[in-house]
Amino acid sequence: MLPKSKIKVVQSLKHKKNRINSNLFLVEGIKSFDELLKSNYKIEFTIISKETLANKKHYKNLNDLYVVSSAEINKLSGLKNNKSLISVVHKKNLKKKSIDFSKLLIALDSVSDPGNLGTIIRIADWFNIKSILCSKNTVDLYNSKVIQSS
């Protein structure tokens, strides 16, 4: 059974100010979660549907795993049709560093659509562009739709 405290955490992380204050963010869906498992991000807890767990047996070894119905996942999710899983993850401390202007970088101003920012991140990775500068008016990097589309 999923504790109410975990539900509240997931619901709160749909809002930028709560992601900033808690230093946590959401990863939703199998594809994004599989990428997360390859990274060195620390997972706080994961909520997974019974159906997904039956198909992805290696997920059973994860710590802090809560198994619920697909309907419960869909109700909690910020995405349209997420019936698989939601994971709460610790942010990394992104350090501001000096910019090497001799290398290619991307500068963004007022990108408001999370899907567009995710696509730009994917393209930057494809072209091995290591620096992306975002104005304060650009959508939150840790928005779950940015995470999913990147």
Where are the regions that the model predicts?
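A residue-level signal for conserved active-site and pocket-lining positions in enzyme catalytic cores
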Residues: 29, 87, 147
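Boundary-proximal intrinsically disordered activation/regulatory segments immediately upstream
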Residues: 1-54, 138-139
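Acidic/glycine-rich phosphate/pyrophosphate-binding loops and surrounding catalytic core
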Residues: 84-100, 138
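RNA substrate-binding interface of SAM-dependent RNA methyltransferases
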Residues: 38, 99-150
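Short loop/edge segments at beta-strand edges and connector loops
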Residues: 27, 67-70, 136
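Structural motif
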Residues: 26, 47, 86-88, 105-107, ...
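Short, aromatic/basic amphipathic alpha-helical patches
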Residues: 54-62, 145
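Glycine/small-residue-rich loop that forms an oxyanion/phosphate-binding "nest" at active or ligand-binding sites
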Residues: 62-90
